[in-house]
Amino acid sequence: METHKHGPSLAWWSLLLLLLGLLMPPAIAQDLTYREAVLRAVDAFNQQSSEANLYRLLSMDPQQLEDAKPYTPQPVSFTVKETECPRTTWKLPEQCDFKEDGLVKRCVGTVTRYQAWDSFDIRCNRAQESPEPTGLRKRLRKFRNKIKEKLKKIGQKIQGFVPKLAPRTDY
């Protein structure tokens, strides 16, 4: 009878331990995807930044090393843009709208995809403004402007010539 009495108690404890084991996060850290590693680097940039507003990921370059080990530093490059949210907000950058004329920064560095290490070496600098048009675009723009001026002059000459073609009424 004693064994029968302890039977349900042992089953209950076993079930409880099983449920607790399922609810607990795994002790082994999982590897981050490339995108997750970049997003964590953006978070680290926001935490270390002295800027007034948060920055949000605008774009990221494709992963350069496909088969790299997760604990090996991998090169990353991405672009962030200033949001409307102040740095002191509790919002995630993904919840913030981009600032209309917000600063854009180009970031390069290395990250590890091994979640337990959280290793980032990122440098972000203000992105270059749109470069002045050079080469073919610049020549096409000049050509277009010359054509506009020539057409304007031709239009003025035609307007001056048309009144001379009208029949004279003073006989």
Swiss-Prot record:
InterPro entries for the chain: Cathelicidin-like, Cathelicidin_CS, Cathlecidin_C, Cystatin_sf
Primary location: secreted
Pfam families, per database record: CAP18_C (PF12153), Cathelicidins (PF00666)
Keywords linked to the UniProt accession: Antibiotic, Antimicrobial, Disulfide bond, Secreted, Signal
One annotated GO molecular function: lipopolysaccharide binding
PANTHER family listed in its UniProt record: CATHELICIDIN, CATHELICIDIN ANTIMICROBIAL PEPTIDE
Job of this protein: CAP18 binds to the lipid A moiety of bacterial lipopolysaccharides (LPS), a glycolipid present in the outer membrane of all Gram-negative bacteria. Has antibiotic activity.
Descriptive protein name: Antimicrobial protein CAP18
